[in-house]
């Protein structure tokens, strides 16, 4: 099973229940599912597909969670980076991941953009509540790409959950950070274990 399937099941169970709260912003499961689906269509319209990496230089916020589920929906690979990393560390990880998109916010903009010359790749830049550089777009503009994009097919019951859904970079204590892949199945199991442990 996949995390994105869990969201679909939550919508079926109680669509009006609150799914996520970020400051003064709230979404019901039904509303958030629609937003994640729109974002998944937007990713597909942006050329993001199976196996593509999407680097997130974001704090814990709604956009982070929505992007993670949207990436899984199109079989792309979420690659979150610690927002406290220095510019050189971020540049190395982006160069190593070779992502299709790099998503950042105001608190990470300087560190992300300062190392662009070192990346060795040219991902599209997506700014969340941050200045948009030449050639980049705002998150809301990315989301709007999903408005007219075709609907995605339902996730088949036998969808391969062994696909890589996440790459986490190690701290690099013995050298350069290394990208550690995690399958969609492992992410689902971790979410279930977390829910059981914390009695959600």
Pin down the residues of each PLM region.
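Conserved AMP-binding A3 loop
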Residues: 28-30, 165-189
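Conserved S/T- and glycine-rich ATP-binding loop of Class I adenylate-forming
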Residues: 54, 71, 102, 164, ...
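Conserved AMP-binding/adenylate-forming core of the ANL superfamily
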Residues: 3, 8, 16-61, 65-69, ...
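Structural core segment of the AMP-binding/adenylate-forming
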Residues: 45-46, 73-144
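Solvent-exposed alpha-helix faces
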Residues: 37-41, 95, 107, 175, ...
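Conserved structural elements of the adenylate-forming
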Residues: 33-38, 180-200
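Conserved pre-ATP/AMP-binding loop-to-beta segment of ANL
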Residues: 15, 132, 147-169, 176, ...
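Short hydrophobic alpha-helical segments of the AMP-binding
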Residues: 64-72, 78, 187
């Amino acid at each position: 099973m996949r995390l994105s399937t869990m969201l679909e099941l939550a919508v079926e169970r109680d669509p009006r229940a609150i799914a996520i709260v970020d400051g003064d912003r709230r979404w019901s499961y039904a509303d958030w599912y629609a937003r994640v689906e729109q974002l998944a269509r937007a990713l597909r319209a942006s050329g993001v597909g199976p196996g593509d990496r999407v680097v997130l230089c974001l704090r814990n916020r709604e956009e982070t969670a929505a992007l993670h589920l949207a990436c899984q929906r199109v079989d792309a690979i979420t690659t979150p980076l610690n927002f406290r990393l220095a510019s050189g560390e971020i540049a190395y990880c982006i160069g190593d991941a070779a992502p299709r998109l790099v998503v950042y916010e105001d608190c990470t903009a300087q560190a992300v953009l300062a190392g662009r010359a070192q990346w060795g790749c040219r991902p599209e830049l997506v700014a969340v509540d941050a200045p948009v550089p030449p050639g980049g777009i705002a998150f809301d503009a990315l989301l709007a790409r999903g408005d007219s994009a075709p609907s995605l097919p339902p996730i088949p019951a036998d969808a391969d959950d062994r696909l890589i859904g996440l790459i986490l970079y190690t701290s690099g204590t013995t050298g350069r950070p290394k990208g550690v892949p995690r399958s969609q199945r492992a992410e689902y199991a971790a979410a279930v274990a977390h829910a059981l442990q914390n009695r959600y």
